[in-house]
Amino acid sequence: MTTATDIAESQLKMPAQREPSVERRLLHRTLKPLFGTPVNAIVTLACLWILWLAAKGAYGWLVTRAVTEGGAQACKVGHGACWPYYEAKLRFMIFGVYPYDEHWRVALAMILFLGAIGITMIPRFWNRNLLVLWSMTIVGAAILIWGGVFGLSYVPTTQWSGLPLSFLLSAVGLAFGFPLGVILALARSSKLPAIRVIAIVFIEVIRGVPLISILFMASVMLPLFMPSGITVDKLLRAQIAIVIFAAAYIAEAVRGGLQAIPRGQHEASSAMGLHYWQAMRLVVLPQALKIAIPPLVNISIGFFQDTTLVTIIGLLDFLSTVRTAMTDPNWVGIAVMEGYVFAAVVFLVFSYGMGAYSRFLERRMRLGLD
């Protein structure tokens, strides 16, 4: 008869089973969805094969078969990427028809915008000083690009083009659209029927039509209603249309954040003696905006890409300058993919960077960090 002592001794004699290491557990967790079943394994291998073919073709086009020296004639007989095309047309694709000798001004303005965006992305700087920062950035960029003061030559808006124009339209549109969107979100959540109905109608009408329609109306229809002799700059009309369109979408994102705030926060604010605007400014809005940041980042990505629509009203945005560069008689039919590849890389870098930032914010909020 087996006793408890015999069982204990047999367990001591058994070799101890080693716990799998963290690396092995992580590897198993990663590979199981990919190769856990025969179907998953086949799909994974097929995708890897397609990626290998795409990477091999891209490497061959960019490196192995690329033309690195010579001009248009050398690229004409080549079968790969035409790097001399970038050397000849890169500045035009970026800056468009902006005066060549003044490119440093728009480059500096873009650096100002990128610096403001970088500071805005740091959570510890999320305070009212951001309003001052963006006001100074927009004024400084306008002085640099427009000129006419401090010894800078005046450059009309008809010569604003390329990547700086796309960047300006999206950055200014979001900078002015954000406070307007917050006001619309608060108005839509208001208990006053008249204000709530006006906000609802405005938001739903703007969100119910495509951006291209609003741009067309701002460019073509609006001048018809202006008094005789009064004209509004085409770029300004497009910018106002983008601000209005952005505000409607931002309002819905902020309203979602407001609805996620527990009712107890409002009641606690009232118990502390705070009136409506104090409660919103000090208690409710800071929490709602943190919740709404990921969708707001997605809206920013979409609006940067949607700036390509301004070409329909005659503005020379980044994608338009890329296309225009291809019409140079010296390069027609020679460099076809190079311009679009460059534009795709620029949009991809921006979109991926903003998407990664959105995921970072989501992880931060899950951890409950401020």
Predicted segments, located by residue:
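Transmembrane alpha-helices and adjacent helix-loop boundaries
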Residues: 2-370
